């Protein structure tokens, strides 16, 4: 089991962070659309379900820092064959995805005036923090006024930007796998051929 990345493959840690982030991101969407489609999102009955969305969103945010740190200090697999323009576009797309993984949880948290309960601990709502107290005192803003533009940004990112960036990421991986027939997708899969679990 290779924990660190190599020139040919992502290590266990990078793959764990990638797929955990992806699972939490997708699950957060499933939960919030369940609330939108099947519940009244303004009723107290929806809050425990929304709390799951908040937990998953913050989990995505918490995972960004170790992902970025590991990307910066660790070896990155070699670029697949392609033009310099393709490599620059791929690099830009990856950083756009990281930006999204920061912006979505951040705006979600800033616009949530309720604590997020993780079970063993809870994260205080932003409206109860010292930074918001400073913002409120300095600019005379109530939390209700503060959260309106923050929520608008969060919803815009969620409805229009997130799926576009994620779809581009997935389509690019499938393009490399099925059209280019290189190892861009397989080197991030949970197991390589040599790591397949045996009976």
Feature-to-residue mapping (PLM):
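Membrane-embedded alpha-helical bundles that constitute the cytochrome b-like, heme-associated redox core
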Residues: 1-199
